[in-house]
From Swiss-Prot:
Transmembrane segments: none annotated. Residues 518-530 have a biased composition (Pro residues). Regulator of the canonical Wnt signaling pathway. Acts by specifically binding phosphatidylinositol 4,5-bisphosphate (PtdIns(4,5)P2), translocating to the cell membrane. Residues 1-77, 179-206, 261-289, 351-415, 514-558, 576-644, 716-742, 786-822 are annotated as: Disordered. Belongs to the Amer family. This is APC membrane recruitment protein 3. GO terms for biological process: regulation of canonical Wnt signaling pathway; Wnt signaling pathway.
Length: 861
């Protein structure tokens, strides 16, 4: 600020002094007058030709100053007058004598010497701008800031040399004046006011000699055009800041070339050159340091730091996202790279920040955000870290950048290259320069130019079913296009980071949720695959018992009936289907029809053996609705539509471990099954009177029973439980549904193959026991048999005995083929007994039968 004022008043003083040029004719006339000196009212000597209006204001001021000094002590004599006015007048006259020397040269054609410099009085005088006070407005700060010892630097030497030349020629001028007959007043005449006045300007004891007269003559003369450049050069050299730091190299921190106008003096001969230099200096290179380097202004430095910070953040975000989501982003967004670059070329022309000086736009300083310093030519400057170096990017590089087709013109200066080390550390050279992204424009939304490369995807872009993409391209919605992908540096970057993390997290969570796809369960009633294939489909609601899986490889009965379906699944080897509709969900026809006649008798015998095998049956029989897949080597129709109401123990066992619907798991029954098989192997089938515990468990019984019950509903189970005695357990043919758990049970039984019992002997013994023992049917059972049809007497052709599920006595539970009321199967008790015995024997006896399930060892034992 002080500098501005200093240059301003220097310029104004020069202009004012130039406004009133002197008249050379008047000066010549003054020399030809009767006396060159005249006394003004104050007593100061003046040329006669010089008029008040023609004299410059500075001369008038100088004149007034000594007048006041003379009036202070009018009677004090020359010594008093000299003591009062000597210092200010002499100092001021020194400057005027310098200016007047050139003026006299133009007027007379000769260089006139000056008394200011070499000579007894002038040798001690130097220009001191602290005493400019009478000539121009007093600015103390400027006066103090200009040291006297620095005045004679550089160009002032030229001025002094010219003045010395003037000093050598001054005697010639005075000789010419004396030849013209000009009479000079004697120095010692006290009456001559001129002599008295002349002594006032000279040291005591000296009269106004030739030097003094020449000094007084040139005191009030003004600058001429010829010497105007010299004075201007002197003033510029004194006031210019460039001269101050030329030797020391210390830059004036507050100096700004763009803000300090140069002296607009167009009168001098060098004015065109200086005007051109002024234009160059007005190109805003920023503040100067040592006339070479540019300092970063606070506004630009702050904004550039902010911009570079967010650029680095965005770059790190893009790199992280490229590493994590690169495979998904490279495809869809790779095509937008060129288009986004071309679009940003137009957007980059917009101003970055409102605080930026509009004039600074003319200086295309570099913004190579994507170009590391290694690609730039080495800087020649000596700038320290933190100072912007005007030579590092240079105008040439900026022009090249502006001319390059793909990259926009640089719009913001880069303070330094301090961050290039980090950039080169993380920059992948294979990717090439990233190029300016729309993030460089603080106020421009990216939605104008499309999504930028590597922009984090919006969390809103996740859609149902798109988890496998993990990061699908965002749809053209408001959030992804206008807001989340805009180029707002501050909050936008944070949103992008959070959004990317959330998107990745959501993708991982959704991927984990999918897990292995569950297999579709087979439709109810779908027959199970043969046991050899072991591909039995799983019934949705029923855990099919392992017995079905135990069906023999030769022709295991596939009895995988659904709970609601009342179908008889015939084994491929079966000769005939059960006559009745067999609503029991799995009445498996696995044998010949001979066994069907023995069903009633078998029920009775089974009634005896139910108590023993209730536990085993609960473990071994799958409570699912599949009918027992007891398959003998010879096919025999097994009326497994067992609708017999089991005693509570049996039902509880069925519902417990084996029936999933009633709270059990087949896996829990496997250990029990192994124990039961061991017990069965140890059992010895005895005579008729033997308690039911003597009978080995029938393993096919559960199928028909539970299939029927499921078909009829859980309430029927309750009724059957109530009707059956706890001692009698339904040892239905231990039906096993075709399920993976059945296969597990089958494997378990295979492992227990060592429990084999001779099927023939066992069957014979069982048959004998069955034949010998009378039918032990309770009255209730007899009534049921009568109601159904002939129990024992009828052969295979006997009509189907219809057993009401509610009316079944525990004794007659077992294998009542007529368990299905609607489609009862005619069965004779002996045949049922035979089948029961055969199945019981084979359960422990034949490994393949064990594997296939509780199958009959013989069709008839």
């Amino acid at each position: 600020m002080e500098l501005k004022r200093g240059k301003t008043f220097i310029k104004s003083s020069l202009q004012v002094s130039h406004e009133k040029p002197p008249d050379p004719a008047a000066v010549a006339a003054a020399r030809e007058g009767t006396g060159p000196w005249s006394v003004l009212p104050g007593g100061q000597q003046r040329p006669h030709s010089e008029k008040g209006p023609q004299a410059s204001p500075s001369a008038q001021e100088y004149d007034r100053c000594p007048n006041k000094g003379a009036q202070l002590d009018p009677k004090g004599g020359p010594a008093a007058l000299c003591g009062a006015t000597f210092k200010p007048v002499r100092k001021c006259k020194t400057h005027d004598s310098m200016s007047g020397a050139g003026r006299a040269t133009a007027a007379t054609g000769q260089l006139v010497g000056s008394a200011s410099f070499p000579g007894s009085p002038g040798s001690r005088r130097m220009i001191d701008y602290r005493h400019f006070v009478p000539q121009m407005p007093f600015v103390p700060a400027v006066a103090k800031s200009i040291p006297r010892k620095r005045i004679s630097l550089k160009r002032p030497k030229k001025c002094f040399r010219n003045l010395f030349h003037i000093r050598r020629n001054k005697t010639e001028d005075l000789a010419s004046l004396a030849a013209e007959g000009k009479s000079l007043p004697s120095p010692g005449d006290p009456s001559d006011p001129g002599g008295r006045r002349s002594k006032a300007f000279l040291p005591p004891g000296e009269g106004p000699g030739l030097d003094g007269l020449c000094q007084d003559l040139l005191d009030s003369e003004l600058l001429a055009d010829a010497s105007f450049g010299l004075c201007r050069a002197l003033c510029e050299d004194v006031a210019s800041l460039q001269s101050f730091d030329s030797l020391t190299g210390c830059g004036e921190v507050f100096a700004d070339e763009s803000s300090v106008p140069s002296l607009e003096l167009n009168e001098g001969p060098e004015s065109p050159t200086q005007a051109a230099q002024g234009l160059e200096s007005k190109v805003p290179r920023g503040p100067l340091q040592g006339s070479v380097e540019q300092l970063a202004s606070p506004a630009q430095n702050e904004a550039s730091d902010f911009t570079r910070f967010w650029d680095s953040v965005n770059r790190s975000v893009r790199q992280q996202q490229r590493a994590l989501l690169g495979p998904w982003l490279s495809g869809p967004q790779g095509t937008d790279r060129d288009q986004s670059r071309l679009d940003t070329a137009g957007l980059a022309e917009l101003p970055l920040c409102p605080c930026r000086d509009p004039r600074s736009g003319s200086k295309a300083s570099s913004i190579d955000t994507g170009t590391p310093k290694s690609e730039q030519p080495e800087s020649v400057s000596t700038s320290d870290e933190g100072y912007y170096d005007s030579f590092s990017p240079g105008l040439e590089e900026d022009k090249k950048e502006a001319e390059s087709p793909g990259t926009p013109a640089a719009t913001f200066p880069r303070d330094s290259y301090s961050g290039d080390a980090l950039y080169e550390l993380f920059h992948d050279p294979s990717e090439g320069p990233l190029g300016p992204s729309p993030d460089d424009d603080l106020c421009v939304s990216e939605s104008l130019s499309g999504p930028a490369l590597g922009t984090p995807l919006s969390i809103c872009s996740f859609r149902v079913g798109a988890e496998e993409n993990l990061a699908p391209a965002p749809g053209p919605d408001l959030l992804s296009q206008g807001f989340l992908q805009s180029s707002w540096k501050g909050k936008e970057c944070l949103l992008k980071l959070c959004d990317t993390e959330l998107a990745i997290t959501m993708g991982i969570v959704s991927w984990l949720r999918r897990g292995p796809t569950p297999r579709a369960p087979p439709t109810p009633g779908q027959p199970a695959a043969p046991p050899g294939s072991q591909g039995a489909p799983r019934a949705p609601t029923e855990k099919l018992g392992g017995r079905e899986g135990l069906a023999s490889d030769a022709g295991g009965a596939t009895v995988c009936s659904a709970p609601s379906r009342q179908e008889l699944w015939a084994h491929p080897g079966t000769t005939g289907l059960l006559a009745g509709e067999s609503k029991a969900l799995g009445g498996a026809t696995q044998g010949t029809g001979t066994l069907s006649r023995d069903a009633s008798r078998e029920e009775e015998t089974r009634g005896h053996s139910e108590g023993l095998f209730s536990s085993m049956e609960s473990a071994a029989t799958s409570t699912t609705d599949t009918s027992g897949k007891n398959k003998a080597p010879v096919p025999s129709t097994w009326p497994c539509s067992q609708k017999e109401p089991g005693p509570p123990g049996v039902l509880g066992c069925f519902r417990g471990p084996w029936r999933p619907g009633h709270g059990g798991d087949t896996l829990d029954a496997e250990p029990m099954l192994a124990g039961c098989v061991a017990r069965v192997a140890a059992l010895k089938i005895s005579s008729n009177e033997q308690p039911p515990a003597a009978w080995p468990p029938r393993q096919d019984m559960g199928s028909g029973l539970f299939g029927q019950r499921w078909a009829r509903g859980p309430d029927m189970l309750e009724q059957k439980q109530s009707s059956s005695s706890p001692s009698m357990t339904t040892i239905h043919g231990l039906p096993y549904s075709a399920s993976t758990q059945d296969q597990r049970c089958r494997d378990r039984v295979q492992d227990l193959s060592w429990l084999r019992v001779e099927p023939t002997g066992l069957g014979v013994q069982a048959w004998a026991s069955v034949e010998d023992q009378p039918l032990q049917l309770s009255t209730e059972a007899v009534e049921q048999v009568a109601h159904g049809s002939q129990l024992d007497s009828e052969p295979r052709s006997a009509p189907a005995a219809r057993w009401s599920s509610q009316g079944h006595h525990p004794e007659s539970l077992g294998l009542t083929l007529n368990s299905q009321q609607e489609g009862g199967v005619s069965a004779s008790a002996p045949e049922c007994r035979c089948s029961l015995l055969a199945r019981e024997g084979l359960l422990c006896g034949q490994p393949e039968v064990g594997a296939s399930g509780p199958a009959m060892a013989e069709p008839h034992l």
